[in-house]
């Protein structure tokens, strides 16, 4: 199985477990993922995933403190309102740069992060109104630039 497929399966299993709203500790999540066949999982990886997907601890129906992924913290999609936040897209021989309206970079970056390596995105760094996107080794910067422009319907 390819690395990207393994990662996608891990993310799906992780999100499915959190939807159950029964895990009170990161250790509980690690054990559940190991039981599902993810042998390389550890507490620090679970911690990073909790942060990446915006998980929070809240009380479930039994009044237990558990990790969950609230719907309002879900990954945004490229709706028309997000497209309007992208003011400029450019690139050089190393990365793609997106300029957004003030305060919008984090929202756009979260969408791009959710696409991940399967779409040629190695990593995303966002400030207040600027985003740097680094492509994976197998994707030329120009190709990633065109993909980003297409995603946000940016004509330049």
Curated annotation (Swiss-Prot):
Signal peptide: none annotated. InterPro entries: Arg_repress, Arg_repress_C, Arg_repress_C_sf, Arg_repress_DNA-bd, WH-like_DNA-bd_sf, WH_DNA-bd_sf. Keywords: Amino-acid biosynthesis, Arginine biosynthesis, Cytoplasm, DNA-binding, Repressor, Transcription, Transcription regulation. Gene3D superfamilies: 3.30.1360.40, Winged helix-like DNA-binding domain superfamily/Winged helix DNA-binding domain (1.10.10.10). GO terms for molecular function: arginine binding; cis-regulatory region sequence-specific DNA binding; DNA-binding transcription factor activity. One of its GO terms (cellular component) is transcription regulator complex. Pathway: Amino-acid biosynthesis; L-arginine biosynthesis [regulation]. It is found in: Cytoplasm. One of its GO terms (biological process) is protein complex oligomerization. It comes from the Bacteria. Its main location: cytoplasm. Belongs to the ArgR family. Regulates arginine biosynthesis genes. PANTHER family: ARGININE REPRESSOR. This is Arginine repressor. It comes from Vibrio cholerae serotype O1 (strain ATCC 39315 / El Tor Inaba N16961).
């Amino acid at each position: 199985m390819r690395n990207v497929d393994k990662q996608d399966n891990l993310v799906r299993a992780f999100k499915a477990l959190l939807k159950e709203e029964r895990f009170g500790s990161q250790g509980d999540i690690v054990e559940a993922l190991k039981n599902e066949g993810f042998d390389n999982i550890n507490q620090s990886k679970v911690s990073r995933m909790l942060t990446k997907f915006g998980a929070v601890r809240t009380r479930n129906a039994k009044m237990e403190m558990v990790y969950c992924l609230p719907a309002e913290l879900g990954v945004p999609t490229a709706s028309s309102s997000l497209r309007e936040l992208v003011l400029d897209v450019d690139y050089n021989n190393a990365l793609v740069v997106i300029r957004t309206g003030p305060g919008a970079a984090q929202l756009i970056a979260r969408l791009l992060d959710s696409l991940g390596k399967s779409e040629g995105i190695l990593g995303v760094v966002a400030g207040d109104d600027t985003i740097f996107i680094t492509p994976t080794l197998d994707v030329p910067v120009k190709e990633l630039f065109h993909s980003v422009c297409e995603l946000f319907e940016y004509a330049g």
